[in-house]
């Protein structure tokens, strides 16, 4: 059975819709890990309205009033948690990791809007959401090869 003349069956439509839902989840997770800024609460509220995930919506409700100071106390310099992948490298080469991230971001056309460094968990979560969206778009366009390429990069 095709949908509205686009030649896609119900399974393909479900695959696209599920991918878009996963992209929204990842984007919301990324936003929740960004430093609060003007308009941030409105943005997370609007995206949460699109998500059918009560626990994640509860996190959004709890995060609404967070201040920049509270964010930095938890995830800022000298805080108990580091949001940076480089902090988990130990004696690894951060230059190599940054170049790998740059190659992936460039290869898939990802230009994060966040002011955070490329190895920040918010940026990386946003990238996963971006890949989910790209994969969904490829499936929607009937381009299985592109969809598989994006899925392999996400894995």
Residues covered by each model-derived region:
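Surface/interface-facing alpha-helical segments and adjacent flexible terminal/loop regions used
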Residues: 1-155
